Amino acid sequence: MEGHKAEEEVLDVLRLNVGGCIYTARRESLCRFKDSMLASMFSGRFPLKTDESGACVIDRDGRLFKYLLDYLHGEVQIPTDEQTRIALQEEADYFGIPYPYSLSDHLANEMETYSLRSNIELKKALTDFCDSYGLVCNKPTVWVLHYLNTSGASCESRIIGVYATKTDGTDAIEKQLGGRIHSKGIFKREAGNNVQYIWSYYSVAELKKMMDAFDAWEGKGVSYWRVPHELIECWTLEERPLLGSLRHMAPIRKRRLITFNEADESVNYKTGPKPVRFLGPSTSTQIKVKNSASVTVSPASAIQTSAGATANRFQSGSRRKAAQRSAPSRATALVGTGAPGHPQASPGAASAENGGTHLPPAKVLLSDKKPTPQRVIKLKRTPLCATAPCLPSPTATRQANSLKPLPGEAARALGVRTENGKNKGN
């Protein structure tokens, strides 16, 4: 059994001698097209001519047969030489093989085969194919507006214009006719995409009798006109394909409407400055100040600091005058204050006794610099009886009343005043 199967496989693989060129092919590939000559030759119904080696002899061009054999195996090779392509077509016709003349022919054959097998309309298959490449499946055409005027023996024929779309051509017709386009003497007829306007004194029935093939107009020109005597005008808008080869024409890309959000989010292929976006009261421009990221100032602290600075400036003038009058007593007060056994006045109390108001400092957080300790100079003010009373400013009085020292601080301040009074008496 195994030997019988091997013999059948050997018989299915055939050796061919085509014009002195030796090829090997399967019988199934040679019979791919059922109605071809090769399918009839290798179907087994007819005896085959063989040479001394047992190869089947085919008296044709072996060089061209290679293209056909590759095509039967599913590979398409189109020669670049025009003469070779013509000779290959003759060889394919001889064997009954539908070998494509060009790539477009090959694609058309594949499209037709696919449509028949899948039961899909060919137009839809072509449209899907063009959509996959983003192309428009349409042949470029133009719209030609032709004018014909016959009056007796005279005849005028000219082209008014060539337009890209039918709408532009229709607008040109309306401009030419003006108000006559809606009159009873205007007759309009259409054939396919083409349109024609006829103006005359004849009725439609009379025009059908006078004009050759009036009802059989296919929208192709106005060459059939045979109208005697009376004046007749005709405007014909006809769609015509562009002349010349389309080989050098760039493919027409489909237009795609892009919304604002899509265009904003998509990749910008054009290099250049981007537009400034409005983000409220100011634009997106950012102005940075050195160490501004770590500084936090509360509004209340800023107001208290400004008020305290005003009060300190007012009180400093009074202290300067009092210091000039009582320099000896100030030295004694400094010695008595630093004596052991007597409590030291706190910085807050000392500043309050000097006539200034102690305000809570503004909340300043500097991450780059370490906080430095404040240097406090302790000065004792002379007794109130020795100096002239000075009236504090309303701002200083208001802030002094708003600050309530702790009971311990108040006791220490009173103790300092009592001790200073004793020293003064001594």
From Swiss-Prot:
GO terms for molecular function: identical protein binding. Residues 305-317 have a biased composition (Polar residues). This is BTB/POZ domain-containing protein KCTD18. Residues 305-371, 389-408 are annotated as: Disordered. It comes from the Eukaryota. Residues 12-80 form the BTB domain. One of its GO terms (biological process) is protein homooligomerization.
